[in-house]
């Protein structure tokens, strides 16, 4: 759900040209990758979400489960979540299932663009796609 869209990227450039252009440059590969493999017009930015969640855990909701990372075979690198407690092992991870998209982008953009959150006046419309 945390996708840096072309509209959000352009908004960043308008608010802080230097930072916006830098973000555009470093995310170009990811924009191309997500389009080629997933047909997403944008760049999924999970790493900033992880940092934002560390700062404000109320941005996300989820559940605690036992999780193991597969280290071989066709599912190499995938997370295996025991959501039904089949293995009866203690939870070792929190699996996040919901995110406050607006809250995240408000925090993210205000910090990297050096803007007060209330100065991001059209952010909610950009996220919802309501701009005309």
State the predicted function of each range.
Residues 1-132:
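N-terminal acidic, glycine/proline-rich low-complexity segments
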